[in-house]
Amino acid sequence: MNIMKRQLCTSSKRFFSTAKNVVKYNTIQDIRNKYFTGTPLSMCTAYDFITATWVNKANCDLLLVGDSLAMTSLGYDSTITLSLNEFKYHVASVCRAEGSSMVVVDMPFGTFESGISDGLKNAIDIMKLDSKVTSVKVEVGSYTKDKYAMKFIEELCSRGIPVMAHIGLTPQKVHSLGGYKVQGSKSLLQMQELYETAMQLQKIGCWSILIECVPHKMAQFITSKLSVPTIGIGAGNGTSGQVLVISDLLGMQGDSVPKFVKQAVNMTDIATQGLKEYIASVEDRTFPERGTHTFKVKEDLWNEFLSSINEK
């Protein structure tokens, strides 16, 4: 058995049939292997073919199709408004991008709250959208209070559906949390419950846990006690990896970003300046430039055309 495990991890030979010319992308085992080396994991959101192409070209380990697209791409004021049908459209678009990034997909608000059976059906539908969808992500509150979500996650795991759990600040539960606030920092009980929730999620089968807006000491401690990778956002650098919303990371909505975001570039300024230059070149007729941006027709054919309509 151990020999077979070593072969599966190191041999170049396949142990399964596959379609021709299938592009390889990261699997959960690939992510685990990197996690065991101690190398931090990289994860970024993507919401369509273009942003997914960027994430893949950058060789990001994981790509999250997050329900945050409700606000960053669709203009809603919260993630709660997003419908499953709208979300599926974006998941399909993301999966058309080529590359090795492993695709993890959120389960938006309303996709599992009405009942376990409905939630299972929706999770299966999401997994079947494309073979690249490797895992779902489920937000969950304290294990002592959000027993339903814990049970739902356990049901998913027991059926072989990979789950990345999301603890700490969970945007889908923002109303019950009293707003977008740091979690696990106000009381001993809150800290204990956050820790125990992570332990319970590992126990019921989650392959990874995302920790959002939690004090760095707390996130680092939880990570040290788990044997599955943690992905942090606003949780310090003591987690197994990091995730950011692509529009925050690339400045696609200007300078207004959360405290925990290190903005790599301000694409809003770059795009706005580019558009201004385009408009100016249109108005002063320097674009399109003849010969550079235009096509030619043979002179004799042009003269023949003019003659044919009596304009010569």
Swiss-Prot record:
Any one Pfam family match given in the protein's UniProt record, by short name: Pantoate_transf
The UniProt record lists the keyword Ribonucleoprotein: no
GO cellular component, one term: mitochondrion
Reaction(s) this enzyme catalyzes, per UniProt: 3-methyl-2-oxobutanoate + (6R)-5,10-methylene-5,6,7,8-tetrahydrofolate + H2O = 2-dehydropantoate + (6S)-5,6,7,8-tetrahydrofolate
GO biological-process terms attached to the record: pantothenate biosynthetic process
Molecular function GO labels: 3-methyl-2-oxobutanoate hydroxymethyltransferase activity; magnesium ion binding
EC number: 2.1.2.11
Function: Probable 3-methyl-2-oxobutanoate hydroxymethyltransferase required for pantothenic acid biosynthesis. Acts downstream in the pantothenic acid pathway.
Name this polypeptide is given: 3-methyl-2-oxobutanoate hydroxymethyltransferase
Encoding gene, per UniProt annotation: ECM31
